[in-house]
């Protein structure tokens, strides 16, 4: 279970909107007070189950004269899940808050090991740690609280898992951290229908000693907060 420490993001300058269509991976059209506006989508995943016509969305106003868009799309409302955070920067920001409160001597973001760059490298005494963070926005089984990752093929994700497996055999304490950006989901399984290679790599990593930890979150229209962490690596080995 988590401590009472609050690991959260509160977005400022937010406004409600209605989703119209996705123009490309980075841009969507929404209605704000009935007016059409092109906004930045802070997630390059498919998000097909979330970004549907007339879906309620939350936008964050960005004051940057050099930007082509004035808003970021940060969350989407889906009735059975309520609010889903789709900000791809949120998982790393939350994990950094969490790691900074775990009594490490060193927490270093964006650390290169082998041929990969991992989200975090930590030290505690003589021990060395590597953590790679993934955000989950795809719900699969609401009754059992299961989400899936990835929602689109990721060669980079497979490479990260294989590099973590190697590091684990060399004495590093390694973790793949799934930040679940929606309510009611507490476990993440590999999306074998989308990319079976990721699931195979996850099993290899687990067998090599990489810990798989799922971080549940409470999500509102303008905020996201970690509520719990569950490590059950054996569940993945036994799949």
Range-by-range predicted roles:
Residues 24-29:
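Short aromatic-glycine-enriched beta-strand elements
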Residues 98-115:
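A short acidic/basic microdomain associated with nuclease active sites
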Residues 45-58, 160:
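Short nucleic-acid-contacting surface segments enriched for D/E, G, S/T with interspersed K/R
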Residues 35-49:
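Beta-strand/loop nucleic-acid-binding surfaces
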Residues 181-239:
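Domain-level recognition of nuclease-like catalytic cores that cleave nucleotide substrates
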Residues 17, 118-151, 164:
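Conserved catalytic cores of phosphodiester-cleaving nucleases, focusing on short active-site segments
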Residues 145-155, 162-194, 216:
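Nucleic-acid nuclease catalytic cores
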Residues 53-64, 216-217:
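Flexible glycine-rich surface loops and low-complexity tracts that mediate binding to linear polymers
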């Amino acid at each position: 279970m988590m401590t009472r420490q609050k690991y959260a993001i509160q977005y400022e300058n937010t406004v409600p909107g209605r989703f119209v269509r996705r123009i490309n991976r980075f841009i969507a059209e929404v209605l704000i007070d009935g007016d059409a506006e092109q906004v930045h989508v802070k997630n390059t995943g498919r998000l097909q189950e979330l970004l549907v016509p007339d879906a309620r969305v939350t936008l964050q106003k960005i004051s940057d004269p050099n930007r082509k868009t004035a808003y970021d799309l940060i969350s989407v409302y889906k009735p059975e899940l309520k609010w889903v955070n789709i900000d791809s920067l949120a998982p790393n920001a939350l994990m950094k808050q969490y790691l900074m409160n775990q009594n490490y001597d060193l927490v270093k973001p964006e650390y290169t090991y082998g041929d990969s760059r991992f989200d975090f490298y930590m030290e505690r005494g003589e021990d060395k740690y590597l953590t790679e963070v993934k955000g989950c926005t795809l719900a699969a089984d609401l009754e059992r609280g299961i989400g899936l990752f990835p929602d689109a093929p990721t060669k980079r994700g497979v490479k990260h898992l294989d590099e973590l497996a190697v590091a684990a055999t060399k004495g590093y304490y390694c973790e793949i951290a799934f930040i679940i950006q929606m309510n009611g989901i507490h476990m993440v399984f590999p999306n074998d229908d989308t990319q079976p290679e990721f699931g195979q790599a996850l099993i290899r990593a687990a067998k090599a000693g990489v810990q798989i930890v799922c971080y549940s979150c409470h999500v509102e229209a303008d905020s996201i907060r970690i509520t719990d962490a569950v490590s059950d690596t054996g569940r993945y080995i036994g799949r």
